[in-house]
Structures are given as structure tokens and as C-alpha cells.
């Protein structure tokens, strides 16, 4: 009986896994659930409101640009901001300069930023000399650093209904030229209603009511405007042998391809009919101008013109800006005010083939045409060696459009087409006001980060940067 008890005891121990067994013989431990890594860090880097700098111009300026660039030697991107002031007497004649302010945000190398205008610009109260409309980036002086050229004007809402009021919107073009520790502000050329600009090597080209071009030779600006006699007010692209111009004249609008200032090819849309139109800076004055209506992709739009272009290898990507009635149909010969319209922006694609402009039928799946914007980037944001499109849309809480709250529209290149990336879970700008944003690799880790800032410093001029943890399409 004693031996039977011992045998049963041994059997019980073996069946229960006791008696010096390894840990692998123990009862299974439930596996730990690891939450997926979020795309962006929870808390943003915040760049302080530069109110003590821009308030010398005005208290609630337009926040036109926040330009990412490298100024100091750490791994983080630095920023140059430009603010300019709206008219205090809109629609009235004014020939005073538009007040403005430049602000340089320098990284401290640890995710923080300080404003240092004195070291970067040589002045606490640095200015470009008016309202900036567009800028172009290049290396004009060949020092390996970014230089910037700005199309400038005094278009702040003042009147523009006759010759005298029109030329009161003119301003001189501006350059930010890099040097060892910062930037020198240079103004070149004649005052104009500057609207477009391109840098091509050591050459800088400006389009306005006239064309201007300059080349930096031995640290001296040389006027070469006679080589570029027809640069578009709206937008142009400069190639080695060609220029592509956005044009609207004689009831036609579209693109022209120029070689040695001669048009060799064009793609044009014919005006459907005319209406009488009161622009935003003439609101309430009763000053109407004739305006063309164009049928684009089966819809009638006011105006319609290519306003921005970029290159992706051989592909030319362009935006057509137009406007539509908020309600009803556009009637030939009718009277309309810009306040009755909503903006529309459509993408179009082109190539140069055998010296001819050819439109390419490339689809953007989920294209959002009702978000207004001026600027977009042609960059590879998901590291697949194909350039994508990032539209810096205006998020405006006062209109009827969906509010992106600072998040750009991101169109991912999938080879033969693009698709609208779902950004619904992305962080948004924290201030409940008009905002805008773009993508940039701020911390130089190879993935793109989300940069957001206001359209105007109505409530705050804070800048918010959400660093990414991974590729934006992972």
C-alpha cells in the first residue's frame, strides 16, 4: 500500500507539471497587446507668437509665408516668416507702403526655437517692403545655401479701379541673399504689381504688369530683361530652352510654350461669354469690369487661369484657379460681385513632347476642388521615389467648405494616378481660426512632419509642428 501511494504521488506530480520542470512547461501567460505607433507625436513643438516683432507693423497681419530652410548647423530646420498688413481703409485710394515684418526662427538643436532677427537679418525690424505674393528658392550666389526671391506688391485691399489707383499697388521686388551667418535684404528692379517669380541658376525673373529679369554676375545685378520679354503675371516655368507661360487674352486662357520669346505651342480654352464683375478690392464701389466665363470640365466658372506650376521630372503640374456662384447659374451679361462666389482650384497635368504642349489625362482619386489655396509642393513625402502633391489649403471656419483645421491636402503618387490620402486622424491646429499647413522633414530623420500656422494673426501667431514617428503612408 505504501508503494502504491508513492507511485500515485509521482504520477500526480508529473501530470501537474511540477518537480523541477522548465518555465516553458508553466501555464501560458496571455500575450501583451502592443498599441500601434501613432503617426505623429502627441504634443507639438510650438514656436511662440512673434507679436513683439510684427506688431511694429500692425497687430493682426496676414501670415503669408513660413519658409523652411537651414540657417544654423544643427539637425533641425529653421524658418523665415513673412507678415504683412491689410488696409485699414479697404477699397479707398492709398499710395502708402504696405507695412510688413520678417521673422527668423532658429532651432536650438533640441526641438526648441528662438527668434533671432538681429543675427540673421542684421536688424530687429527686418522688412521686405510690402506684401509678398509668391517666392522662389534657389542658390543665386553659389554658396550652397538657399536664397529667396519675392514677387512683391502693395495689394492690401486698397482701390484699383483706375490707372492711379492701380499703380499705387506697385512695389519693388525683393531678394533674401544668403551670406555666412544669415541674409541680406536686397530690392532690385522697378516697382510693379508683382505676382510671379522664378530663380534659374544665378538669374531671377519676375512677372507682373511687365517682365523683369536680372542676373548676379560678380556680386552685381545685371538687367537682362530684354532676354525675357513676356513673363506671365500669373505663373511661368523656366526651362533650359523653353518658358511655359500662363496666359489669358483675347477671350482665351491656358498655357503657351515659348522658345526664344516666340510662342511655338499652346493649349487654350475659349471664353464662353462675358459678365460684369466687381472684384473684392472694389466691393461696394459699383466699379464693374467685364469678366470672361469659361467652361472647364463641363462647368461654368468665372475667370479661370493657371496660377501655379511645378515640375516632376518631365511632368508639369498646374493649378487652375477659378470661382463659381454660391448658388444659381451664371447668366451672360449679368452683374456679379466676388462676395457672391466661392473659389475653386483644379489640378491639370502637361508634358512637352516634340516642342509641343500636351495635356496628360492623369486622375486624382478623391480630388478636393472646393478647398482654396495658392501654393502646393511637388515632393516625395512617403519615400517611394515618386513625387507627390501637397496642397497648402486655406482652412477658413467662416465659409461653408469642409474645414481641414490647418492640415494640407496630400495627394499620393501611385504610379499612373494620385489618390487623396486620408488625413482624418491627423492632429489639427489648436487655434480656432483660419489656418494653413504643409509637410516638411523638420528634424531631418527622413520622415515628413506636419507644420501648421494661421492665415492671419487674429488670435495668435503661434506655429505648431507635429513630428512624425514613421512614414506618413505606413
Regions found by a protein language model. Name each.
Residues 2-10:
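Sec-dependent signal peptide recognition
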Residues 14-15:
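C-terminal motif of bacterial Sec signal peptides marking the signal peptidase cleavage site
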Residues 84-90, 154-159, 249-252, 322-327, ...:
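Short glycine/acidic-enriched loop and turn motifs that connect beta-strands
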Amino acid at each position: 500500500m505504501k508503494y502504491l501511494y508513492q507511485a500515485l504521488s509521482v504520477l500526480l506530480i508529473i501530470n501537474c507539471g511540477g518537480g523541477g520542470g522548465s518555465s516553458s512547461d508553466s501555464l501560458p501567460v496571455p500575450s501583451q497587446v502592443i498599441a500601434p505607433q501613432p503617426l505623429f507625436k502627441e504634443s507639438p513643438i510650438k514656436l511662440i507668437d512673434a507679436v513683439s516683432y510684427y506688431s511694429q507693423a500692425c497687430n493682426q497681419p496676414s501670415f503669408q509665408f513660413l519658409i523652411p530652410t537651414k540657417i544654423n548647423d544643427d539637425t533641425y530646420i529653421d524658418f523665415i516668416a513673412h507678415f504683412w498688413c491689410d488696409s485699414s481703409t479697404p477699397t479707398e485710394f492709398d499710395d502708402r507702403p504696405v507695412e510688413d515684418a520678417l521673422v527668423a526662427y532658429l532651432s536650438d538643436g533640441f526641438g526648441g526655437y528662438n527668434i533671432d532677427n538681429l543675427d540673421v537679418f542684421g536688424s530687429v525690424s527686418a522688412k521686405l517692403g510690402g506684401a509678398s505674393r509668391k517666392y522662389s528658392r534657389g542658390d543665386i550666389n553659389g554658396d550652397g545655401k538657399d536664397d529667396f526671391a519675392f514677387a512683391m506688391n502693395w495689394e492690401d485691399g486698397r482701390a484699383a479701379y483706375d490707372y492711379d489707383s492701380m499703380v499705387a499697388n506697385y512695389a519693388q521686388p525683393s531678394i533674401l541673399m544668403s551670406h555666412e551667418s544669415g541674409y541680406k535684404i536686397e530690392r532690385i528692379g522697378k516697382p510693379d504689381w508683382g505676382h510671379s517669380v522664378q530663380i534659374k541658376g544665378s538669374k531671377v525673373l519676375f512677372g507682373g504688369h511687365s517682365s523683369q529679369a536680372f542676373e548676379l554676375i560678380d556680386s552685381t545685378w545685371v538687367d537682362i530683361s530684354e532676354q525675357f520679354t513676356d513673363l506671365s503675371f500669373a505663373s511661368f516655368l523656366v526651362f533650359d530652352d523653353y518658358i511655359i507661360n500662363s496666359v489669358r487674352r483675347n477671350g482665351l486662357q491656358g498655357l503657351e510654350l515659348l522658345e526664344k520669346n516666340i510662342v511655338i505651342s499652346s493649349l487654350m480654352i475659349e471664353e464662353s461669354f462675358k459678365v460684369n464683375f466687381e472684384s473684392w478690392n472694389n466691393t461696394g464701389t459699383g466699379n464693374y469690369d467685364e469678366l470672361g466665363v469659361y467652361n472647364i470640365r463641363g462647368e461654368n466658372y468665372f475667370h479661370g487661369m493657371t496660377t501655379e506650376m511645378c515640375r516632376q521630372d518631365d511632368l508639369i503640374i498646374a493649378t487652375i484657379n477659378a470661382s463659381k456662384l454660391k448658388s444659381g447659374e451664371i447668366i451672360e451679361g449679368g452683374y456679379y460681385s466676388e462676395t457672391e462666389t466661392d473659389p475653386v482650384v483644379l489640378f491639370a497635368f502637361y508634358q512637352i513632347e516634340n516642342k509641343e504642349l500636351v495635356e496628360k489625362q492623369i486622375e486624382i482619386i478623391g480630388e478636393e476642388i472646393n478647398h482654396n489655396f495658392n501654393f502646393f509642393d511637388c515632393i516625395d513625402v512617403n519615400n517611394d521615389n515618386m513625387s507627390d502633391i501637397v496642397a497648402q489649403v486655406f482652412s477658413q471656419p467662416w465659409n461653408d467648405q469642409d474645414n481641414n483645421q490647418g492640415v494640407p491636402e496630400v495627394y499620393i503618387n501611385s504610379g499612373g494616378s494620385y489618390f487623396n490620402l486620408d488625413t482624418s486622424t491627423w492632429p489639427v491646429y489648436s487655434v480656432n481660426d483660419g489656418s494653413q499647413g504643409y509637410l516638411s522633414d523638420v528634424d531631418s530623420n527622413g520622415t515628413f512632419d506636419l507644420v501648421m500656422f494661421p492665415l492671419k494673426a487674429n488670435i495668435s501667431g503661434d506655429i505648431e509642428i507635429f513630428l512624425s514617428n514613421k512614414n506618413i503612408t505606413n
